[in-house]
């Protein structure tokens, strides 16, 4: 199978038999949404299989963006004020929208994470660091900084669900992290998201998934403008859970193998995106940096560029964006295709 058959997402077919078994619990209770019976099953599976620590709550949401916004809204409600966050320019727009619309955008450093030198002279309450496409920053640099400066630390792990740092899943670090289970992500099916957060904030976040309404208060419950309908429905949960049950180990192993091939056979003039995991990361795409800017239409196979900087005046973010090449990484990718990609990129390097 050649590069003309290359796909960004693996062929994800529903296991209808397994989905039907899962949905039977919904049929028995006639509850398919509003936190029905499959939600807790999915949260338990994520905790156990993604090795999430007991000090963290696992809370599924409708998608990765709603996970980030529900997380921030819940913390705002808990602390009784709207917090000011700093986010990096090299990331997805979610961290500058909704409850984060007033976040401060700063550049990244040469390691691919938020530049801590850029926050020295500004007032803020917390930082959001994005781990890019499965690669992780030097996490302890941010943990130590936020601890020393009494700041909240959130990791946007939308595409980094199973990369380890110093022996534990990177999702366990900071006060919280979020994961995306969007269909384009390695572990996703359809659409979904997940918050992994210190248990201190769990109750306010769960209430925030339901417009801020605390059902235990009955008629006394009041909605919150720091909340919304962020809940995942049980039908989505069933498809995600079924896909994970059947494939998560295969995804972890194959994505590690793919990364290993690129690591040992880097195309000329390309280098891997910065990564601080000792073991191979589980990447959502293989991110390579060329030694000079190039146009994506010069690459003769399916590939992309992420992320267009939120602030185009951020020099390091813009440099990364102009030089990055994001290559498909999924369980359907064959070794033959990988080596063909490497060969094509070597030719590209010779001609450019």
Curated annotation (Swiss-Prot):
InterPro entries associated with the record: DegT/StrS_aminotransferase, PyrdxlP-dep_Trfase, PyrdxlP-dep_Trfase_major
Molecular-function annotations in GO: pyridoxal phosphate binding; transaminase activity
Origin superkingdom: Viruses
SUPFAM superfamilies to which the protein is assigned, alphabetical: PLP-dependent transferases (SSF53383)
Pfam families tied to this protein: DegT_DnrJ_EryC1
Alphabetical GO biological process terms: polysaccharide biosynthetic process
Protein name in UniProt: Uncharacterized protein L136
Annotated source species: Acanthamoeba polyphaga mimivirus (APMV)
Lineage: Viruses, Varidnaviria, Bamfordvirae, Nucleocytoviricota, Megaviricetes
């Amino acid at each position: 199978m050649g590069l003309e058959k290359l796909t960004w997402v693996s062929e994800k077919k529903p296991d209808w038999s397994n989905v039907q078994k899962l949905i039977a619990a919904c049929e028995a209770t006639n509850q398919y949404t509003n936190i029905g019976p499959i939600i807790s099953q999915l949260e338990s599976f994520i905790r156990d299989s993604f090795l999430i620590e007991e000090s963290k709550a696992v809370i599924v949401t409708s998608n990765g963006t709603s996970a980030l916004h529900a997380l921030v809204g819940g913390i705002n409600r808990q602390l009784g004020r709207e917090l000011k966050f700093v986010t990096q320019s090299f990331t997805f727009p979610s961290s500058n929208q909704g409850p984060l619309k007033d976040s401060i955008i700063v550049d990244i450093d040469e390691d691919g994470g938020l530049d801590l030198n850029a926050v020295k002279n500004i007032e803020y309450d917390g930082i959001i660091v994005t781990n890019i496409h499965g690669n992780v920053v030097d996490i302890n640099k941010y943990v130590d900084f936020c601890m020393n400066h009494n700041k909240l630390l959130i990791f946007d792990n939308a595409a980094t669900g199973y990369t380890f740092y110093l022996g534990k899943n990177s999702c366990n670090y900071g006060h919280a992290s979020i994961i995306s289970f969007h269909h384009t992500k390695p572990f996703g099916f359809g659409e979904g998201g997940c918050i992994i957060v210190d248990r201190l904030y769990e109750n306010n976040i769960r209430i925030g998934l339901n417009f801020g309404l605390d059902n235990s208060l009955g008629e006394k419950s009041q909605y919150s403008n720091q909340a919304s309908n962020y809940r995942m429905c049980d039908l989505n949960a069933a498809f995600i859970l079924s896909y994970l049950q059947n494939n998560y180990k295969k995804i972890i192993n194959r994505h590690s193998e793919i990364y290993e091939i690129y690591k040992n056979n880097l195309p000329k003039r390309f280098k891997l995106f910065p990564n601080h995991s000792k073991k191979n990361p589980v990447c959502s795409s293989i991110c390579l940096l060329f030694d000079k800017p190039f146009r994506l239409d010069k690459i003769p196979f399916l590939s992309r560029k992420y992320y267009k900087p939120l602030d185009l005046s951020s020099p390091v973010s813009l440099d990364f964006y102009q030089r990055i090449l994001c290559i498909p990484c999924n369980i359907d990718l064959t070794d033959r295709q990988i080596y063909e990609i490497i060969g094509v990129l070597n030719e590209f390097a010779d001609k450019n």
